[in-house]
């Protein structure tokens, strides 16, 4: 049996204000934002989950129509081995590197707002290790920005993972352990 759907069409009209110079182009008056902002970056020992609501409030503006969040969660396995727990260690300049990565992405992609924090120290299975938030007027730009920041943090920020495997052995990830 076929159903009949009523469709209500809405007509929109683009209008230009009388005084274009009076507009705030930050996006507060219906204009897409230009320029990008790194809202916050950090390396911390504190759990990331309690930061989410405040981070979202800082990243979002009325001009942002999309928020993409990458939340890297500690899992109980890695490359076929069962993981009991892990700890991250960071180079003393890791904060500078994560800020640099976010600034690069902000320079490459117009109209994004970025927030990125990596946790160090012991982290339990199921907890967040890296959280990236990217807001933009449209989802494609927000997805691109979030992916670029997450990928570059993993590739370039000097942070190393020490995994305690279920069999009692220890495995370092991100550290060259081959003999010199």
Locations of regions flagged by a protein language model:
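N-terminal, polar/charged subdomain of small-to-medium soluble alpha/beta proteins
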Residues: 2, 7-129, 135-147, 151-180
């Amino acid at each position: 049996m076929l159903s009949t759907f009523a469709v209500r069409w809405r007509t929109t009209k683009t209008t230009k204000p009388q005084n274009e110079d009076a507009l705030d182009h930050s996006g507060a008056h219906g204009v897409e934002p230009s320029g990008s902002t790194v809202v916050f970056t950090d390396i911390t020992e504190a759990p990331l989950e309690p930061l989410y609501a405040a981070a979202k409030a800082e990243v979002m503006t009325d001009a942002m129509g999309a928020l993409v969040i990458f939340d890297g969660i500690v899992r109980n396995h890695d490359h076929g081995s069962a993981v009991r727990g892990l700890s991250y260690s960071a180079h003393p300049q890791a904060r500078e590197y994560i800020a640099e990565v976010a600034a690069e992405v902000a320079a490459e992609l117009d109209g994004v707002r970025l927030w990125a924090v990596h946790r160090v120290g012991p982290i339990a299975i199921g907890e967040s290790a890296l959280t990236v938030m990217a807001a933009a007027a449209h989802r494609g730009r927000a997805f691109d920005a979030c992916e670029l920041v997450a990928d570059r943090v993993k590739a370039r920020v000097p942070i190393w993972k020490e995994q305690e495997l279920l069999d009692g052995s220890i495995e370092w990830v991100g550290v060259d352990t081959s003999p010199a």
